[in-house]
Amino acid sequence: MKWLSRSYMAIIFLILYAPIIVVMLFSFNASGSLSHFAGFSLQWYRELFRDGEALTALKNSLFLAVVSSLLATVLGTFAAFSIYRSRSKRYQRVMESVSNIPMMNPDIVTGVSMMLLFVGLTAILKFNDILGLGTMIIAHTTFNLPYVILSVLPKFRQMDKNLTEAALDLGCTPAQTFLRVELPSILPGVVSGLMMGFTLSLDDFVISHFVSSPDFKTLPLYIYNQTAHEVKFSMYALCTLIIIAILALLIMVNVAGSVGERRQKRSSKKVGARK
């Protein structure tokens, strides 16, 4: 049975990672042809960094991902804190369910509804065109919020309440207790939510397609426009760089989570020893 289990897992991993491996491999292909591999070359990476439109789209995507993920992390952390501190279990269940709905909602429905909202605001406020960077930030922050809440709320519930009580007994104000005790305890969840929001924002195409303007194009929109006509090998290089960046983010999240858990365990042991 072991060989069957291992064979099954090998097939699953092959299906999952074969497309990624092919993209990364052909990003170094010297021939510029999909029919054969003529050797390793960095020419497509050089061509990519000479493409001004691609670099502009990359800058737009990075700026949008950073701003929207930071906003979503701040708002989502305080939303999770509010849910956690509520004394009503019914309120907590309702708010959790409401915050989970956008994650189950199809992206195309979210994109169309946001577009209609922004177009309606354009008519009400009598603006010529409201779509652009502002609407992109609002949209990306909105769909990132539930993921931040989902990451942070369990950390609040796993937090050792003895640490909070000890800080209050020692004279800390509620604000100081949150910043010095509770925030370090939930930091792995906050970082996970931030990285998840950054990745989702960087990757988003459907919602961005409906709320963007011709003057502000993100990387997924640029790649789609390019592949709609002819697949350039520089796009393989671009996809490879994105894959490497996301892999680095995942490693950072895992490391931050492990470090945070070890710190929390050490703090709990110290409080227990003092008691």
Residue ranges of predicted features:
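C-terminal transmembrane helix and the adjacent membrane-cytosol boundary/short C-terminal tail
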Residues: 1-8, 12-15, 153-168, 174, ...
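Transmembrane-helix boundary motif in ABC transporter permease subunits
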Residues: 2-3, 67-99, 119-120, 178, ...
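Short membrane-interfacial helix/loop motifs at transmembrane-helix boundaries
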Residues: 18-52, 117, 209-214, 267
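Non-cytoplasmic
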Residues: 21-32, 189-224
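Membrane-interfacial helix termini and adjacent extracytoplasmic/periplasmic loops
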Residues: 33-35, 42, 108-141, 175, ...
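Periplasmic/extracellular loop-to-transmembrane helix junction in inner-membrane transport proteins
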Residues: 33-66, 88, 228-230
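Interhelical loop and adjacent transmembrane-helix boundary motif
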Residues: 45-54, 202-252, 256-259
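Membrane-cytosol interface at the C-terminal ends of specific transmembrane alpha-helices
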Residues: 129-168, 176-182, 192-194, 205
